[in-house]
Amino acid sequence: QAAQPSAQPTLAQVAQTPAATQAPAATQAPAATQSAATPAAQPAQTAQAAQAASGVAATRTNQTFLSYTSPAGTTSQYHVYAEGVDFSKPVGVVFYFDGDYWRNDQSKVYDPSGELAQMAASAAAQNMLFVPVISPDANRYDAGVTWWEDMERNGEFFRSFASSFIAANGVDSSNVWTMGYSGGAEFITYELNTKPQTWRNGGGSIMVAGGGLDEGTPSAALKSQPMFWYANSNDGSGETYPQTWSARGAVEGGYNAYRNAGYTNASATVLNGSGHFDYNFSQILSNSLSKGKATAAPKVEQKAEQKTEQKSEQKQNTQRARTM
């Protein structure tokens, strides 16, 4: 796990944020079903062509435990939540990375009908697919299955998968979000957001109970994109493994590192929750996507104003040149 930052400045406390509750685990994941409101799947030839070109099949219904192998030979699985998404309109996507675990029953990614389904509903409300990705890590010893160990391999796998998925499903590449919890949040801030963004040209990042940065340089391409960190007030040292690691410390350190690197559309929120295992992920996702949309709107208007000012200035310069 990444080292805890040495300095932990105090963040503003959220006064009315209730303590989040853990969603109950489902005993068995249901088979994938198609919503009556979901448009019919693409014609077979179109879907097959998309799959052949990208290595990922176009998906219009909920699917679980699909496999993908990267060009480097790294293989893992993912889920797709597509119900409630209107494919006649621009479609975005949220890729989700869970925290560390030793047994499958310790991770949300092995319970597709539990909290993941609730998070998918939050994404669908913004017309976005929800895609939890399982770490390629096969080592269940030491730190367990993680995203932050062997990040170069995991990063190559995910960037390849994301590019293929976005192409196969016609996703708007300017509306691609990542969300990570604990070690999954560390993967975003240490790996994905410090490397070239060849797989997307817009979107945002959500880090829950993690997301530090004490080495590496944030990508300049993301400076205007939303980055939102969240930590429970009591999620400090002793809450998780290793005992010396503090999720809240990682949140504060990562937020400060990215802000100092020029990321102006960033925020860090301390929730009135308990410890490391008490987060309302669907609420955090819903709030973050809404906040990201709200903070992005003024920037578009500002750019339009800048273009108007530039045209006016160019016109004045032309008139001056003609006068001279």
What feature does the model see in each segment?
Residues 79, 93-97, 129-134, 175-180, ...:
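Structural recognition of the beta-strand scaffold that forms the well-ordered cores
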Residues 91-93, 97-159:
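Active-site machinery of serine-nucleophile hydrolases
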Residues 167-170, 174-222:
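Primarily recognizes the serine-hydrolase "nucleophile elbow" in alpha/beta-hydrolase
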Residues 97-104, 166, 181, 188-193, ...:
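Cell-envelope and extracellular/periplasmic
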Residues 3-93, 253-266, 291, 297-299, ...:
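A domain-start/cap signature at the N-terminus of enzymes
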Residues 111-121, 193, 209-222, 249-253:
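Alpha-helical scaffolding within the catalytic cores
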Residues 85, 143-183:
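Gly/Ser-rich "nucleophile elbow"/oxyanion-hole loop immediately N-terminal to the catalytic nucleophile
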Residues 228-239, 252-324:
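C-terminal catalytic histidine-bearing segment of alpha/beta-hydrolase fold enzymes
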